[in-house]
């Protein structure tokens, strides 16, 4: 069975990458490619919509796709837990609701790095995240850093927030689920994240660096293929990889 995919954000870097992957895959078909000038009616007839647009445009695209009964893979950053919960409620109101998969990062290595941090979280007193991306990235902290912080907090459970001395000082970063996150945006980078965990007499650093967009290919294809039969809301590529992490769905 061929899965017809509409790519919203088709002229961006991720959109162009996805379109090429879809063209090369035997089981996928590029149904439509939308940019900022396109009408959302162009989504009609797709089985799956891939949203790799902009935080301001993403909600309307997701809403239109859901209302039309199309599955959605959301690769756009900026979706808070509250907004994702709104999507869940919207799906519950539909008799034959499609699946929606939110993917903060399509890189398998990055997702595994976040999983390793969650696994280690309960064994260290202090945890902080330092993430760096290219100058064109519009949101900070990154969706990957937010997702990592949420996984860390869920793994620690009743142990309370991560120890973060003087976290009220601006230079200490933004607290996300109790974890200080420091963001850098600069030329010469694509994507890099370090999770630094500190305990008595030792530190552990879990680092992932994306050096080329090809790192996203496996995750994009996996999400598109799973979306066609997905139910409800799925958050994170980790669930599609079979990683059973605390607080995941």
Tell me what each language-model feature is:
Residues 55, 59, 114, 214:
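Glycine-rich phosphate-binding loop at the start of an alpha helix
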Residues 30, 72-73, 100-102:
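Hydrophobic beta-strand scaffold residues
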Residues 52, 56-75, 84-86:
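Rossmann-fold NAD(P) dinucleotide-binding segment
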Residues 44-45, 49:
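Alpha-helix C-terminal capping/helix-to-coil transition sites in glycosyltransferase folds
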Residues 8, 52-53, 75-76, 103, ...:
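Structural motif
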Residues 4-43, 125-249:
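C-terminal substrate-binding/catalytic lobe of Rossmann-fold NAD(P)-dependent oxidoreductases
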Residues 55-56, 78-79, 105-106, 186:
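Short glycine-rich anion-binding loops that position phosphate/pyrophosphate groups of nucleotides
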Residues 63, 76-100, 108-111, 115-119:
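Rossmann-fold NAD(P)-binding glycine/threonine-rich loop
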């Amino acid at each position: 069975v061929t899965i017809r995919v509409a790519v919203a954000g088709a002229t961006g870097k991720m959109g162009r990458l996805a379109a090429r992957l879809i063209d090369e895959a035997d089981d996928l078909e590029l149904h439509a490619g939308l940019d900022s000038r396109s009408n959302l009616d162009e989504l009609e007839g797709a089985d799956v919509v891939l949203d790799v647009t902009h935080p301001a445009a993403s909600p309307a695209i997701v809403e239109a796709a859901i209302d039309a009964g199309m599955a959605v893979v959301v690769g756009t950053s900026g979706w808070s837990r509250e907004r994702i919960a709104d999507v869940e409620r919207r799906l519950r109101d539909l008799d034959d609701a499609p699946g929606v998969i939110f993917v903060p990062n399509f890189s398998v290595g990055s997702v595994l790095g976040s999983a390793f941090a969650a696994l280690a979280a309960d064994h260290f007193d202090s945890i902080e995240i330092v993430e760096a991306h290219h100058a064109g990235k519009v949101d900070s902290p990154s969706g990957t850093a937010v997702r990592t912080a949420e996984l860390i907090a869920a793994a620690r459970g009743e142990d309370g927030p991560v120890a973060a001395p003087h976290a009220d000082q601006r230079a200490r970063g933004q607290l996300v689920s109790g974890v200080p996150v420091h963001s850098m945006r600069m030329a010469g980078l694509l994507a890099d994240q370090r999770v630094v965990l500190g305990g008595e007499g030792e530190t552990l650093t879990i680092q992932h660096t994306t050096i080329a967009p090809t790192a996203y290919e496996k995750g994009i294809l996996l999400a598109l293929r799973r979306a066609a039969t997905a139910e409800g809301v799925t958050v994170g590529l980790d669930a599609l990889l079979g990683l059973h992490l605390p607080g995941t769905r």
